[in-house]
């Protein structure tokens, strides 16, 4: 049993190292304007009031490229507010604090939860409290949810978008690293999804699978040629 636990810990640690190695961090402030343009674009239907991503960034300056790609490029997701949530677990048993960064907007919120090791990481519960706090302080406009069995509310609905990394074919990894990542993702599947870990409402989930990396050197530089043929007219 001890050997199995050691193997799992080793695979998880090495897999996390590889994920960080191949993560492409972007300077978040450079994308505040594109997010604002999407937020204000009336031609794109609003997906939800609050679009939430779980973010592993260690600071508020950078963010994983895949998150911004999901919002701006992969079926542009317009929302009243964009939330990027990360959590830090402390050695103290009962810590419940949060810090946030808005980049001078009232629709972009980077939030870091500081939780004790005994506290459940119930992101949806904490986030609703934070949204209520920010609406009360005037930092977030009321979202005016009119239709609910609980009556009207200033807090709108939520969508949680979870990105699952996958290893694409011919990714350029060594056989050992590819095996480590595939084993880690198999363990993750057995242990439960992020939705279960963070207590998210599964009815409000968007799950997207993204390749861990793209082997640029494997792309062909040749162009396909258009053939000439006799035109057929009716």
Residue ranges and their predicted role:
Residues 2-13:
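Hydrophobic core segments of alpha-helical transmembrane domains in multi-pass membrane transport
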Residues 11-21:
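Transmembrane-helix exit/juxtamembrane "anchor" motif
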Residues 20-234:
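Cytosolic C-terminal regulatory domains/tails of membrane transporters and channels
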């Amino acid at each position: 049993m001890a050997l199995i636990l050691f193997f799992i810990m080793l695979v998880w640690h090495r897999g996390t190292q590889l994920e960080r190695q191949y993560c492409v961090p972007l300077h978040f402030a450079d994308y505040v304007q594109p997010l604002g343009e999407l937020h204000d674009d009336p031609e794109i239907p609003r997906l939800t009031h609050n679009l939430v991503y779980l973010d592993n960034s260690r600071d508020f300056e950078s963010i994983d490229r895949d998150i911004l790609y999901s919002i701006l490029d992969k079926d542009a997701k317009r929302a009243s507010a964009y939330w990027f949530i990360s959590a830090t677990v402390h050695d103290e048993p009962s810590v419940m604090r949060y810090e946030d960064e808005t980049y001078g907007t009232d629709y972009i919120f980077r939030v870091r939860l500081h939780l004790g090791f005994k506290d459940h990481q119930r992101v949806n519960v904490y986030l609703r409290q934070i949204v209520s706090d920010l609406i009360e302080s005037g930092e977030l406009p009321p979202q005016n949810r009119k239709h609910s069995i609980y009556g009207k509310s200033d807090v709108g609905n939520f969508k949680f978008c979870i990105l699952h990394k996958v290893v694409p074919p011919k990714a350029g990894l060594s056989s050992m690293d590819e095996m480590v990542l595939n084993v880690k993702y198999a363990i993750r599947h057995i242990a439960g999804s992020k939705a279960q870990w963070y207590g998210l409402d599964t009815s409000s989930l968007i799950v997207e699978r993204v390749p861990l990396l793209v082997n640029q050197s494997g792309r062909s530089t040749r162009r396909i040629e258009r053939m000439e043929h006799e035109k057929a007219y009716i």
